[in-house]
From Swiss-Prot:
Purpose: NDH-1 shuttles electrons from an unknown electron donor, via FMN and iron-sulfur (Fe-S) centers, to quinones in the respiratory and/or the photosynthetic chain. The immediate electron acceptor for the enzyme in this species is believed to be plastoquinone. Couples the redox reaction to proton translocation, and thus conserves the redox energy in a proton gradient.
Cellular compartment(s): Cellular thylakoid membrane
Spans annotated as Disordered: 169-218
Protein name (Swiss-Prot/TrEMBL): NAD(P)H-quinone oxidoreductase subunit I
Annotated Gene3D superfamilies: 3.30.70.3270
InterPro entries documented for this protein: 4Fe4S_Fe-S-bd, 4Fe4S_Fe_S_CS, NADH_quinone_OxRdtase_chainI, NDHI
Annotated ranges, domain 4Fe-4S ferredoxin-type: 55-84, 95-124
Catalysed reactions listed for this entry: a plastoquinone + NADH + (n+1) H(+)(in) = a plastoquinol + NAD(+) + n H(+)(out); a plastoquinone + NADPH + (n+1) H(+)(in) = a plastoquinol + NADP(+) + n H(+)(out)
E.C. numbers: 7.1.1.-
Assembly description: NDH-1 is composed of at least 11 different subunits.
GN (gene name): ndhI
Alphabetical keyword list: 4Fe-4S, Iron, Iron-sulfur, Membrane, Metal-binding, NAD, NADP, Plastoquinone, Quinone, Repeat, Thylakoid, Translocase
Amino acid sequence: MFGFLKKVVDYTRDAADAANYLIQGLAVTFDHLRRRPITVQYPYEKLIPSERYRGRIHYEFDKCIACEVCVRVCPINLPVVDWVMNKETKKKELRNYSIDFGVCIFCGNCVEYCPTNCLSMTEEYELAAYDRHSLNYDNVALGRLPTSVTTDPSVQPLRELAYLPKGVMDPHDVPANQPRAGQLPAEALKSLSLQQESVQGDEGESLQDASDQDQPSG
């Protein structure tokens, strides 16, 4: 008798635990059903990199002293420093500097230990290329000023979602009381067409005024 009652109690406890676990799982599922998908519609939407983002390395040729500290602190000895010794000045003369971003792990050691601060990390992360050899940047390519997402009018920049409090920004739109940092392609084309129409209208009015002034008075 007691054995049968114990089995009934154990079965009831197991059923209650199973129902509790099922309810917890369904609660998580229903919670996600109420949320909109957080999908960045690249390339029409782009994330704005967070503070101290380690993107493409910027290099200043005039500041480099060819000390090769960046090569020694690099985990894979990646930077290539081409220099010759000037016998007259007894100093190194830098000829070329290159970094292969197809191999770089963007650890930032070269930037941190550079004695002249000729290296810096930028927020540029769009480095995709059809040929992996084109990822080997020389001193000219490294010296190019970085591009910023916020200065591109054809995209809608979105701030890093982890740094925003809940409810500040809809994943697919911005709040009504906040202006967009950029424009979608359709909006950019519309604004450009309006600007062209206004310019043409101003030119027509100026020509009409000039013709009226040229006509002799009766």
